UniProtKB/Swiss-Prot annotation:
GO terms for cellular component: endoplasmic reticulum; endoplasmic reticulum membrane. Disulfide bonds: none annotated. It catalyses: an alpha-D-Glc-(1->3)-alpha-D-Glc-(1->3)-alpha-D-Man-(1->2)-alpha-D-Man-(1->2)-alpha-D-Man-(1->3)-[alpha-D-Man-(1->2)-alpha-D-Man-(1->3)-[alpha-D-Man-(1->2)-alpha-D-Man-(1->6)]-alpha-D-Man-(1->6)]-beta-D-Man-(1->4)-beta-D-GlcNAc-(1->4)-alpha-D-GlcNAc-diphospho-di-trans,poly-cis-dolichol + a di-trans,poly-cis-dolichyl beta-D-glucosyl phosphate = a alpha-D-Glc-(1->2)-alpha-D-Glc-(1->3)-alpha-D-Glc-(1->3)-alpha-D-Man-(1->2)-alpha-D-Man-(1->2)-alpha-D-Man-(1->3)-[alpha-D-Man-(1->2)-alpha-D-Man-(1->3)-[alpha-D-Man-(1->2)-alpha-D-Man-(1->6)]-alpha-D-Man-(1->6)]-beta-D-Man-(1->4)-beta-D-GlcNAc-(1->4)-alpha-D-GlcNAc-diphospho-di-trans,poly-cis-dolichol + a di-trans,poly-cis-dolichyl phosphate + H(+). The gene is Alg10. This is Dol-P-Glc:Glc(2)Man(9)GlcNAc(2)-PP-Dol alpha-1,2-glucosyltransferase. InterPro entries: Alg10 (IPR016900). PANTHER family: ALPHA-1,2-GLUCOSYLTRANSFERASE ALG10, DOL-P-GLC:GLC(2)MAN(9)GLCNAC(2)-PP-DOL ALPHA-1,2-GLUCOSYLTRANSFERASE-RELATED. It is found in: Endoplasmic reticulum membrane. The keyword rRNA processing does not apply. Pathway: Protein modification; protein glycosylation. It comes from Drosophila melanogaster (Fruit fly). Its EC number is 2.4.1.256. Glycans are attached at residue 25. One of its GO terms (biological process) is dolichol-linked oligosaccharide biosynthetic process.
Amino acid sequence: MNGSWKLILPVGFVLYSLPLFLRVNGTSDYVIDEEFHIPQGLAFCRKEFDVWDPKITTFPGLYLIALLLNPLSLCTVTGLRMLSLAGAGINILLLYKIRRRILAGSGGNSYAAHEAITMSVLPPLYFFSHLYYTDTLSLTMVLLFYNYWQQEAHLPAAVFGAASVLMRQTNIVWVCMATGMTVLDTLVNQCARTGRVPKENVRLMGKELWLQLVSSPQLLCNCILSILAKCCFYASIILPFVGFLFINGSIVVGDKSAHEASLHVPQLFYFAIFAAGFGISNTIRQFRPAAELIRRNRVLSLLALLLILVVVHLNTEVHPYLLADNRHYTFYIWSRLYGRFWWFRYAMAPAYLLSICVLFCGLRHMPESFKLMFPLSLFLVLCFQRLLELRYFLVPYILFRLNTRHTRKGYAEWLELGAHLLLNVATFYVYFTKEFYWKNYRTPQRIIW
């Protein structure tokens, strides 16, 4: 049945989405940021590489993929949007393969397929699968990279890692995360092979590993050589990117004014709410352990709650775009709750703490290298973004969700899938029925994620 799922999932996903795609495609020439992406994509599709919109802030990966349409004479708005739908079809296949490998047989192929479907219809991700935005194809490249990295096929992994960075600069963080995990896993595996201590005692958090490395120059040399052999391809991405940062002075290309880096720690709190809210099956499984963790550590929990309140008070950033653009749900969340009631951002602190504990409990069973590298990567990719933008949460959420444990509670997975589908119905209904006009746009504006 494994081979059947590899065909059924992508084909079924595209066929299921096609009527909705055609309806979305007929509503507007451009949807918000598509006014930058589509003209640029059409120019590259026609091989007009001297055309570049200075307002674009990402590398040209999204537009280079448009070259695939040129031989097919599909350099149209519909053709560009179809690239995203095709990418979403590839994503569901990759999600299935990666999830099945992580589960290692637990739950079977049908369970992995169910999980892949659930992640593919994650409402913000599913919505942008119908538009020519960076998000879907950026995730495609990250998943291709992660898939090959899992299999220790480091050369193709590096190729797709570079492609992911061409899609979105912040994807360099996930390349660095996987590189760091490779280094840490190599240290553990090399030390375990010596047989000097039981394999189960060789842990990143334990002293046995580090004592072995310090006491054996030969072992240390073997580790270094093995790490260099595995990571040289990733270094060929990371080092040039460091050079780019040094020369450019910023991770952003083009118009840097709207994307200046500034410390914004509450992004972690927003992500925790996002992950706990959409990852219903993990939240159901980890809610009791998280509540017990808080109960057993009341003093630490109180201190953590106070720290959250201090961070919210001192470091809440409000980007002008968040207040100015009423075409996004975040505008309404902020204007009607966070911005309207001064106390609301503080009242959310207990929910932030509980959501963080749910994520922490979800991490506990994962490999030690992931437990170390993922939180660091999450901090780097989110906490220097001033703008609250749910699309920034998609890749870290999917990587976290892929690594969660099999719930063994069938209703939890079905509840999560059902909630995603119902929310998709609601958000597309709003998109199709709620129209309003801006003075400088001739076409009606609509509300999206």
